[in-house]
């Protein structure tokens, strides 16, 4: 719980500064690049999470890996490293993106499907959800063969499970109690 509170304070402060300086889009892009690097390159995450590594080494690495980042993003990352708060970075990135979507009247919807969604179906789901919520929908789609068929949709903290896996589970529970 404490980590979420800390991450919220940093994300809010950065978002307000970014709005003030007109750098929201630039910082958002920087965070997308950084998030991708953390997810796809385990060494980046290991370095950031390593409490033994001195801050100067972490800052030097970040500067070498991301020389084109906005100066505000660079300063923010250096501040996090100096304050030993870099472990909160994934949460800060997610909260910053959430604030940006909120400001733009957008909503992130996570869709999990047994197979890859074809273009028309993906567009149809997005359109329906947009009409239901009254917001522009951004979809994060991933495949999960364990679902067997159907989809699972996560909108905020609600989950709509239309998967065959869930239907079989419910059938099993109704039979065996």
From Swiss-Prot:
Membrane topology of the entry: Peripheral membrane protein
Matching Gene3D superfamilies: N-terminal domain of the delta subunit of the F1F0-ATP synthase (1.10.520.20)
PROSITE patterns per the UniProt record, alphabetical: ATPASE_DELTA (PS00389)
Cell compartments where the protein resides: Cell membrane
Keywords assigned: ATP synthesis, Cell membrane, CF(1), Hydrogen ion transport, Ion transport, Membrane, Transport
GO CC terms: plasma membrane; proton-transporting ATP synthase complex
Transmembrane stretches, start-end: none
Organism expressing this protein natively: Carboxydothermus hydrogenoformans (strain ATCC BAA-161 / DSM 6008 / Z-2901)
Task of the protein: F(1)F(0) ATP synthase produces ATP from ADP in the presence of a proton or sodium gradient. F-type ATPases consist of two structural domains, F(1) containing the extramembraneous catalytic core and F(0) containing the membrane proton channel, linked together by a central stalk and a peripheral stalk. During catalysis, ATP synthesis in the catalytic domain of F(1) is coupled via a rotary mechanism of the central stalk subunits to proton translocation. This protein is part of the stalk that links CF(0) to CF(1). It either transmits conformational changes from CF(0) to CF(1) or is implicated in proton conduction.
Similarity annotation: Belongs to the ATPase delta chain family.
SUPFAM superfamilies in the cross-refs: N-terminal domain of the delta subunit of the F1F0-ATP synthase
Coiled-coil segments: none
Protein name, as recorded: ATP synthase subunit delta
Keyword GTP-binding (UniProt): no
Signal sequence annotation: none
Superkingdom of origin: Bacteria
Main location as per UniProt: membrane
Any GO molecular function: proton-transporting ATP synthase activity, rotational mechanism
Assembly notes: F-type ATPases have 2 components, F(1) - the catalytic core - and F(0) - the membrane proton channel. F(1) has five subunits: alpha(3), beta(3), gamma(1), delta(1), epsilon(1). F(0) has three main subunits: a(1), b(2) and c(10-14). The alpha and beta chains form an alternating ring which encloses part of the gamma chain. F(1) is attached to F(0) by a central stalk formed by the gamma and epsilon chains, while a peripheral stalk is formed by the delta and b chains.
